[in-house]
Amino acid sequence: EDFYKNNQIFPDGTGPLLFGGFSFDPNQYRENYWSDFLSSKFMIPTVLYTQVDKEGYLTVNMMVKGQDSVKKHINYFEEVQKLVLCEEYDGESHISPLLLEKEEIGVEKFKGNIERATTLIKQQAIEKVVLARQLKVKFNEDISTEYVLQRLLKEQPTSYTYILEGEHQHFIGASPERLVQKQGDYVFSTCLAGSIPRGKTRQEDHELGEELLQDPKNLIEHDVVVHMIKEAMNSYCYEVEIPSKPSLYKTKHIQHLYTPVKGRIKEDVTLFSFIQKLHPTPALGGYPQQEALPIIRKLESFDRGWYAAPLGWMDINGNGEFIVGIRSAVIQQKEAVL
């Protein structure tokens, strides 16, 4: 490992990468539709394609033992090459399955939990807590994750599109939110909180954006996230750069208040150090962190699994990027939970 680090054989994002993530709360009970996903799971992919600027890199990983024959590995590589060069998936010809059922789970309980959380905030037991709810859908045939993935890539080009596949369940989504990125001696994070819809015209879109930039409620919500992330970054950085005012980050249907954060990392601080410190952010958990998690655990009657959790990759140099797993669904055959 030291040899690779010292000689910089691989550009960032290439070579043997670890891909995976963590559950939102490892102390929460596990539900059946998350049975393929442990509290943490990482893997090295067999085939990886990475695009860095205008250059593409193909990485093929294989396990080699001293007694193995060279021919065996050559044959293996040729089989992998055939797989990589196979015909591109044509999502346009796919016919969407028929939606049979759509159920909002625990609506009344969710409303009651909002009232309880509001009471706790008024009593100053917590500054902010974010509660989630579920939507369950069922189709007439198995859901094609390839089709969903292609649609997300096409419709959400400014988001991080991801899929983690298990034996029975698949977690898929398109998140706009970076948790942390490490590049050498520098680390980057994103404060993304406060939102408003996109406009139907360019003028309406501009006016809505300006309204968001001046809205007191959304600015306060955003400042809570900025404050928490700044505190976390200061713990592990020599210096931290944060703009004084947020700007706008626009996706297809919504625009957010956005503040980028950059820091120069102290020695012996790893990417996982930042993940542990930053997760969960106030936008998906609450503030302060230690007070918010037990409240979520008590009020929510379901397992978030890997929803709103850190997902990403790390290379052999210790660089990498993790996002927050939102705008997502866990899919199992004909059913999905959003």
What role is predicted for each listed range?
Residues 100-107, 138-142, 198, 215, ...:
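Hydrophobic alpha-helical scaffolding
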Residues 20, 49, 124, 180, ...:
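A residue-level signal for conserved active-site and pocket-lining positions in enzyme catalytic cores
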Residues 2-128, 132-134:
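Non-catalytic accessory segments adjacent to catalytic cores
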Residues 116-120, 151-155, 195, 211, ...:
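Generic, well-ordered alpha-helical scaffold segments in large soluble proteins
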Residues 175, 258-338:
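Conserved hydrophobic core element of enzyme catalytic domains
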Residues 52-84, 174, 181-252, 327, ...:
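Cytosolic ligand/metal-binding cores
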Residues 47-50, 161-163, 172-173, 178-179, ...:
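Short beta-strand scaffold segments in enzyme catalytic cores
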Residues 91-178, 225, 229, 236, ...:
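Active-site pocket-lining segments that scaffold enzyme catalytic pockets across diverse folds
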